[in-house]
Amino acid sequence: MFVKKGDKVRVIAGKDKGTEAVVLKALPKVNKVVVEGVAIIKKHQKPSAENPQGAIVEKEAPIHASNVQVLDKNGVAGRVGYKVVDGKKVRYNKKSGEVLD
């Protein structure tokens, strides 16, 4: 999976298209990511001992990894490639050529 936790990404599809934010969680088994402030859903919680009223909680839902592009340090969005530098496999931005890791 080309996106990692902590990466700054731009959403390229969906209702939050154009938003730039940080990846909070990567879910490689389902190829999805949770991005800060993107795809907000409302979750209804039942009343419990600690919260007798119940609540409606807003949280981020996972979006497909193909709907985001990783930004490099200069803010250039591009596809991610892999190459070997000094015997280590690193990710790089194919558009700018800048190493991401």
UniProtKB/Swiss-Prot annotation:
What organism is the protein native to? Streptococcus thermophilus (strain ATCC BAA-491 / LMD-9)
What is any one GO biological process for this UniProt entry? translation
SMART domains per record: KOW (SM00739)
Q: List the disulfide bonds.
A: none
MF GO annotations? rRNA binding; structural constituent of ribosome
- Tell me, in a sentence or two, what this protein's role is: One of two assembly initiator proteins, it binds directly to the 5'-end of the 23S rRNA, where it nucleates assembly of the 50S subunit.
Q: Which is an annotated Pfam family here?
A: KOW
Which protein family is named in the record? Belongs to the universal ribosomal protein uL24 family.
PANTHER family with a match to the protein in the record? MITOCHONDRIAL RIBOSOMAL PROTEIN L24
How it assembles, according to the record, is: Part of the 50S ribosomal subunit.
Q: What is this protein called?
A: Large ribosomal subunit protein uL24
